Amino acid sequence: MDKCQDKEVAFFGKITAGITHELKNVLAIIRESSGLMGDIISISPEAVIKYQEKIQNSMVRIKDQIERGVNLTDRLNKFAHSTDETLSKIDLQETIEQLVTLAQRFARLKHVVLKTVPPSQEGQPVTLVTRHVQLLMALFASLECCFTVMSAGGEINIGIRKNKGKNAVHVVCKGDLPGQSEFVRNISESENWAALQEISACLEGSANLDETEHCIVLMFPEKISR
């Protein structure tokens, strides 16, 4: 078994725990809102009219949380299916967008905003034949590298750009950041950077720091050889 495959279970556990925690929050809000409605209704028929606005607000909250819950379960289902094939043809932009949705809770805990950036050039989508789960792991590891140096209120933009004629994923940190040399040193000395290097190597790719714009640049082959 490849050394990166050993870490896939831990990665799956971390992401799944994050999404199920979000689902627990959804259910807690629905329970609280429905409980309030039940309390009002149990007072008397007249109370329903008196507190109609509160009931209406509770119904809106419940509807919003149901939609949020459906979205979360869709994400989890799609994530689970990323293991269907060892090697698969994937749309890189779609994978970036998938990762950003999966990582929202982790960013929120750091008080950091995650955003995807549309491809710099329109045209055919960028596709790779690679290990889908490990690609998600590499993208997530790059975010964790950024989290180590970012302050609350920062922003991470992830998108595809051309780099030396090849497609590359640029993970750009913005906000109250250390100076360029300190940014590079702090990330390169972190455990997350070592993990990112290992995962990138398993994917026959590379991860480099671009200090000119506080950025991590990820490059992967169009088709993995093994």
Which residues does each predicted region cover?
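A conserved short beta-strand within the histidine kinase catalytic ATPase domain
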Residues: 154-161
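Conserved signal-transmission helix
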Residues: 1-11, 224-226
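Conserved ATP-binding N-box helix of the HATPase_c
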Residues: 14-25, 131-154, 194-202
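Glycine-rich/acidic phosphate-handling loop/turn and adjacent ATP-lid/helix
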Residues: 166-197
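Histidine phosphotransfer helical core of two-component systems
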Residues: 4, 25-67, 87, 125, ...
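Conserved DHp (HisKA) dimerization/phosphotransfer helix of two-component histidine kinases, i.e.
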Residues: 49-113
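Conserved catalytic submotifs in the C-terminal HATPase_c
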Residues: 113-126, 163
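Glycine-rich ATP-binding loops of the HATPase_c
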Residues: 201-218
